[in-house]
Amino acid sequence: MANCAIVGINWGDEGKGRMVDYLTDRFDVVVRYQGGGNAGHTVVNDKGKFALHLLPSGIFREGVVNILGNGVALDCENLYNEIETLRAAGVAITPENLKVSERASLLLPWHRELDALEEARLKDKKYGSTKQGIAPFYSDKYQKKTVLAGELLHPEHLKAHLADLLEWKNLTLTRVYGAKGYTMDELTAWIDDFGAKIKPFVANTTAFLREAQANGKRILFEAQLGALRDLDYGIYPYTTSSNAIAAYAPVGSGLPTAKLDEVVGVVKAYSSCVGEGPFTCEWFGDEAAKLREAGAEFGAKTGRPRRVGPIDLVATRYGVEMQGATSIALTKLDVLSYMDKIPLCAHYEIDGVQTDDFPFPVLLDRAKPVMEYMPGWQCDISGVRRWEDLPEAARSYVEYVEKAIGCPIGYVSVGAERESLILR
């Protein structure tokens, strides 16, 4: 397990943060390689409960170097606030254990504003953005209209670059949205405040990673969101604006020569989704409310109630294939303990035809779930620590899912704490 990626198989919120936190004692470096502050990785440890939006989940482990790669949307303001929150809880964060790629682009204040303005313009056709500026940021990045973190180390160049970007961006704000533009003084003040606080962490992380790889260091690549939110392979356009698949890890981390030895895909024992778009197995009413409360399904970033339903084996199998998962961590099995029978979406029916293949996005609105049911176990399993001590019905459920998705389940979680993970 020299190089390992931990990725989401579904819509995100599967429990990747707790898996990274659990596995980091086996690794020397943890790298976030895509996304920004639009999603949260929840970690529960002896220092408390934390929702990490930008910081890699290895930040709690002594001796682990954490890196924000070039593929990350670097929001200096939110990153600094997150650092200070963890420091207040007794977590040591220094340039020795946190490094920011000099090639990471900065998410600027206007990106968040443009995100909110566009969602308001779309009205009932909105995508369900978290309004953290992610889509405008990546749009600017691919238009080569962003500032690199390394420019914080070259203030005269940065000032001239910002002036060029300011003129261009104000045209969009004022003429497209009728909003107020920014002044150079406002932008400079933000850079002088938050950019200056992040500047000590900026480094040539590609050189660091190459040296680490040459010295046989073990590297863990941490993804955000899941395969169904991937820009290219997800449920477009209800996706994020970056690539959440494991194949992007070498590129977004700053180590394009990296070979992944293992890909751990994280799957929740039921389905959950934040945001708009097709969600074939969605429950509503009291049924949804009960599952949502049992699983504490509220967004780590927004606090919004998540959409929930039974596990979708069609979508999960597709996610496993897109991620190239070599093993699976099945999380939140304990949440299903209240059910007398456990529903699973085994197939889809589209226009009267049953299928096991995940369809092209436009067909998902016509897809209906074909359900199967398994016996429940109806007892508290949160204290179980060995596979053989789980109720037979719980083991049967895991084995059924494993066979249906075609990938071995190596980990089963029955709680949020580090120790509540069962190894098979």
Which ranges hold each PLM region?
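Non-transmembrane, aqueous-exposed alpha-helical and coiled segments at domain scale
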Residues: 1-424
